Amino acid sequence: ADAASYISRQPERNIRILEKYRNDKRYLSKRNFLKERSIFGLDFVFREIPNKLDVFDMKTFKEYDGRFVIVTTDAKTGKVHYFDQKDVDETFEVFCATCALPGACPPAKINGRKYYDGGLSNPIPIDKCLEDGCDKMLIVLTQPEGFIKTPRKSEKNMAKIMKLKYPAIAEELLKRCDKYNESVRLCEKLEKTGKAVILRPKYKLNSLESDTGKLR
């Protein structure tokens, strides 16, 4: 979803929002989880900010003449599902799906179905780029060179919980690390052959990094 601000020609918008609101309890906090079952304040992040506080240029976004793909995971099947800019409206529900992580945020409801973050089924959708005919790719990774994702006990425990209601998501949780590492290897292979350029930090970042200085 962060890339949307580049499509709307507002490249400074993401860091501006993070610097101003990342440590605001309305943005992300345990209090939100108690109130909404989500660590993110979904209404604040996806309704109040883009529609009032730091307005997202929906008109420019919609007029983009390329295709902007949003990657999600179908909660029932565990399969990857792709949306594009025509599916985005002022509710930003499609973007809500991109932060819907099991245990941290409920799935987003879109057209009668529920969706989780695409990172579960397709962590780095480089295969989608290749299928769509892209011959030169700019790949932005969130971890430094040499990083290998390893299973965490918390993920295994969450998979057990998710298995009761969303068994397919539970399976994807357990396969997530292998899929991520495999995707990184493919990215590096493409970089060596000149088909991709990889941008990544020199230091490790937490998934919910609160140090906005590191993010800049």
PLM region spans:
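C-terminal domain-closing interface element
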Residues: 40-63, 178-181, 198-203
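Short, hinge-like loop/turn segments at secondary-structure boundaries
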Residues: 9, 155-158, 215-216
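C-terminal helical/tail subdomains of lipid-metabolizing enzymes
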Residues: 91, 183-216
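Structural motif corresponding to alpha-helix initiation and N-cap regions
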Residues: 55, 122-123, 184
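Patatin-like phospholipase
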Residues: 1-52, 84, 89-97, 138-141, ...
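Helix-centered, glycine/charged polyanion-binding patches within enzymatic domains
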Residues: 136-189
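Active-site gating loop/helix substructures
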Residues: 61-159
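Flexible, glycine/proline-enriched loop segments at strand-loop-helix junctions
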Residues: 32-40, 79-83, 113-116, 171-173
